Every structure is written in C-alpha cells, then in structure tokens.
Regions:
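RNA-binding basic/glycine-rich loop and surface signature characteristic of RAMP-family CRISPR effectors
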Residues: 1-119, 123-178
C-alpha cells in the first residue's frame, strides 16, 4: 500500500515519495478521501460513466445518477441538485488497528522502502527512485457513514443505492488497490 504525501524537497539519496503519516504520532494512515475517491472511480467504470464524461469524474448532478447521488457532485446550483440532495456517503480516515498501533509503537517495522525503476521507452534511460510503502498484512480500521434521505420516496432510493453502490464498490475495492 502506498498513498503518497509528496515532498517539498528531495535530498540526494533521499525518499522522493513518502507515505502519508499522522503529523503527531508519525503513524501511517489512509485518507478517507482516497478510499472514497477509489470507490467512486470503480463505480464510474462499472456504470460506464467515463464515456459520457470524457474520462473525467462524473459531476452531472442528476438525481437518477447513482454515482452523484451517493458520492456527491460539484453541481449544486441546479434544480436537479435540489432534488438530489447532499452526498450520502462519508468515509473517515483509516487508522492502524489497535494491534498494529501497538506493534508500530514497539518499534516493529511496518513501513518499507521499495526501489522502483522506470525506463524511457525510446532511450532506455533508467529512472530509479525509492518509494515508501506499508508492508503486506498491516490492518486499518475505518468508518463509513451513509445517509438515507427522503426525497419524496421515503428514502427507498437511498436504501437501494446502499446495496447497489456502496456495498458493491467495497467489494470491487477488495479486488483492486489504492
């Protein structure tokens, strides 16, 4: 797992792609926005939204758009937005489980440096670079909240979309990566 934090400056031999860490505890975490964004992206693929958006994020804002209704839309000014209502899904940051926090605090290494290399396909020039990543098997806890809103249908559409969109996107995420 690698969720990059970027780096203001890179020193020779230094890490140019560190993971995101809590600034107080230095524990790695996964931003809820990264999880939600990946879930949204997977559902846009599943519902074939990328053709109509030219490969961009779907922000049509239409009330019948499952993606915009569940994940939200920047289109908040239209009449359709009033019918759709606010985003239904809230994904909180994923933090280390209690067990893994203890291991981290006891000095167990849960972060590793991996050296990667990209090649220029024309010149074959190598571009080696180190990245930080979480070792396999580390577990995180996270919380998802889903709002069911009555927009004239007693909340039935939101209940249906919980199964069709939220649960399905979590299943797809398990078979994918962040």
């Amino acid at each position: 797992l690698h969720i990059g934090a970027g780096n203001d400056k890179v020193e020779i031999g230094g890490m140019d792609n560190p993971i995101i860490r809590n600034p107080l505890t230095h524990e790695p975490y996964i931003p809820g926005s990264s999880i939600k964004g990946k879930m949204r992206s997977l559902m846009e693929w599943k519902f074939d939204k990328l053709k109509s958006t030219g490969g961009k994020v779907c922000f049509c804002g239409l009330p019948e758009c499952k993606v915009c209704r569940v994940f939200g839309s920047a289109n908040t000014k239209s009449e359709e937005a009033k019918d759709r209502g606010p985003t239904r899904l809230i994904v909180r940051d994923a933090v280390l489980t209690k067990e893994w926090k203890e291991k981290f605090r006891n000095g167990n290494s849960i972060v590793e440096e991996k050296n990667e290399n990209s090649l220029n396909r024309i010149t074959a020039e190598a571009n080696p670079r180190p990245i930080e990543r979480i070792v396999p098997g580390v577990e995180f806890d996270f919380e998802i909240s889903y709002r069911v809103i009555d927009t004239g249908d007693n909340g039935e559409t939101d209940k249906k979309y919980f199964k069709e969109v939220v649960l399905e996107s979590l299943k797809l995420l398990q078979d994918d990566y962040l």
